[in-house]
């Protein structure tokens, strides 16, 4: 069931943000295998460009639908890939995503 859930999330994100997504990464306690039934599902969406308000609304709709369908809290953050590449070696959060992240989808 979890793979189906992740596939559905990836599909929803890609539909909400066409041509912007570079990769989608699961990180945090679920990726580390230290999650509990109450843990949120941390997702980083790496983008080629910033989101406008309409894109933010579409992504929010996907996340809310997933939260309700699976009775989980999906914590989805967007990261502009150029900013990530510039700061990944010095920002602890980015280093954690690199170290523990599981890539759910990547652009070809």
Give the location of each predicted region.
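Catalytic core of pol beta-like nucleotidyltransferases
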Residues: 1-22, 32-37, 48-108
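Short beta-strand->loop micro-motif that forms the acidic, two-metal-ion catalytic signature
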Residues: 42-46
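Conserved H-loop
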Residues: 29
